[in-house]
Structures are given as C-alpha cells and as structure tokens.
UniProtKB/Swiss-Prot annotation:
Lineage: Bacteria, Pseudomonadati, Bacteroidota, Bacteroidia, Bacteroidales
Native organism: Azobacteroides pseudotrichonymphae genomovar. CFP2
Family: Belongs to the TrpB family.
Originating gene: trpB
Tagged with keyword Amino-acid biosynthesis: yes
Name the record gives this protein: Tryptophan synthase beta chain
Enzyme Commission number(s) from the entry: 4.2.1.20
Amino acid sequence: MKEKLTNNTFQVNEKGYYGKFGGAFIPEILHENINRLQKAYKSIIESQEFIEQYYKLLHDYAGRPSPLYFAKRLSDKHKCRIYIKREDLNHTGSHKINNTLGQILLSRKMGKTRIIAETGAGQHGVASATVCALMDMKCVVYMGKTDINRQNLNVRKMEMLGATVIPVTSGNMTLKDATNEAIRDWCSNPDDTHYIIGSTVGPHPYPDMVARFQSIISKEIKSQLPEKENRNYPDYLIACIGGGSNAAGTIYEYLYDNRVKIILAEAAGQGIHSGHSAATIHLGKIGIIHGSKTLIMQTSDGQIEEPYSISAGLDYPGIGPMHAHIAKQGRSEILAIDDNEALSAAMELTRLEGIIPALESAHALGIFQKKQFKTNDVIVVCLSGRGDKDMETYYK
C-alpha cells in the first residue's frame, strides 16, 4: 500500500534515513570506520580536487559519456520513442565502474590500502578489481559459489586483474551470503581496509554515496536529450532494480521533476507467489539487513527468505532504502518481471537492435511486455550492462 506523500524529500537526511528507511545498524567494531566515513565522504567527494580527478577518470578511463541511443526498431514495435542509455559500453561492461572509481579514489584519500567487495553477477567484482589494478591496491572479492558457477567468465577476469576471489558456501551461496562474508572480513580488518559496497544498500553513508557516484547516468541523460527531443526530460525512466544502484543513477536528477514517471523492474523469478522470486518491494516487510532498515523478504517469524532470480545481480532479499522510500511514497511504479519475460525481452532487443543485454537489464526491457505507452511518449531505459557474462544462460 502506498503511503500518503507528506514530505517532498527523497534525499537522505543527516542521520542517514530516507523517511523511515536507512540508518546504520552495525557491529561495534565497525563504528569507528563508519563514523569516519560518514564524516569524511561529503567533504572529500564535494572538493574541487576530487571532482576533477573523478571526472577525468570517468572520461579518459571509463569512456564516458555513454551514448543515449534511439532504438528505432524497438520503438516501432512498441509504438513509442525508446532511448537506451548505453551503460553496457562503459569500460568493464556495466554501470558498476562509476561507483568503483569514486569509492576507491575516496578510500585512497582516507589512507586505506586494501579493498574488499561483494559481487553477484560479477560486474561489481570486475569493476573493483579493475580500478584496484589501476590504483595499485590489494583487492579481495567475495562471491557466492552458485554465482561463481554461473558467472565463471567474470571470475577469470577478476583473477587476471590480480584480485583474490573467495567462494562463499554458506546459505544460498549468492549475493546476500557474499555480503555477509565481506562484512565479516571488514570487522577483522577495520584499519587498512575499505569495503566497497556495489549497490545503494548497507549502512549510511553507502546508499547515498553510491547513488551520488551513479548519478552521472541521469546527469548525462539530461544533457543528451535536448539534442534528440528538444527537451531535457523524458516522459518515463525505466531501470531494473536489485539493490538499486543503476536505478538510483538513472532517476537521481529527475526525482523532483513530476513530469517524469519512474518505472522500476524487480525480479519475479518463477512468479511473485511461487516461493522462487526476488520481488522485494512487492513482498518485503520492514526489517534490518546488512546494516540498513529497509524492505526485506522475510518468513512469518522474521527470518530472511532466500531470493531467486535467473539474474545473479538481482537475487538480493533486500532493497536500497532510497528505493523503499520512493516506492512507498508513490514516486516510483514497481513492476515484477519473471525469468521468461526477461529472456524474451533480451532476445527481442538482440534481434531488433543488435544489442545483447545483461540479464539484469533484460528485466527493465521486460516492462514493454507489461505496459503500453502512447505514440509520443519519450522513454529512456538504462541498459545497465552487456550480456557477455550471461551467454551460457541464454544458450540454455
């Protein structure tokens, strides 16, 4: 049920909350690290020196700006004007490098020498290992064994880049479990280590920090659209949502623009009520996961349910607190896309436009099977990553 819109703010407050979601619920051993990060991150990332270094890396190393591509054949089929924000063309093949460049640059300025990361689909792990190689920092990546088996190409990339990939065999052996192990590592190594969370989840300031680094996506959309549509806003923004980083980046600059409707696609897996899904916003109840108060898939007695999605990057049982807040406020519409709908949408884009999307991004494209748009609607879809890593799944 949507809550009445009583407060026109979608940004984090000084205590790390988006409405009633967020905060920092952490072990005592991490208090000093988190407090130091909370105090330092804004002053560092808002400094002119940091901004210049960060944007130079985005341009020269990551290859930004990423193109805003008019998908004519896809538009003709669905009878609207569809633009694709090509995050798949960034260095490392996804939006993840926007965040890893920012966080690793930040961690160096804070005197850290070792980076740990969690990864599901492997894209955040590859992006972390890539930037660590660039900046000569040690890198350890935690990855569930289930995800290692289905994303082996990315594992090889991480190892080639010099990272140590540690298989996680607890729980469902996916993203949630990898995150648990990364947090344990950080508790054991608080002095020299920075934990680089890949999504808008975790304790404050991570959700805000990751959203800020990913906001380059919507900044570019705003500057690119006028050349194509003679206005700087679309009618709709569409993105997939697991933890919420690419979605946060896609909508960040438009949150207060009521001309722009926001539609986010979460993973329905084998069906919302099948017991095998990751549709957290549809099914979740308020709880605490990985240091944040948010919506979580839970059993009746409060145990976290194991999520499922064909996409390794979307099977997370929680959601970023910003997204929990804007969904409950009615600012975003959430649609659940199942495995088959995502696979069908991936094939459609591939055959019509010659672009093979990541399975995560395919969920966003699946919205066109669920919803009809008007002929003159301008729609921007964030293609968060490329599909190389998912070829074995597509072939099945």
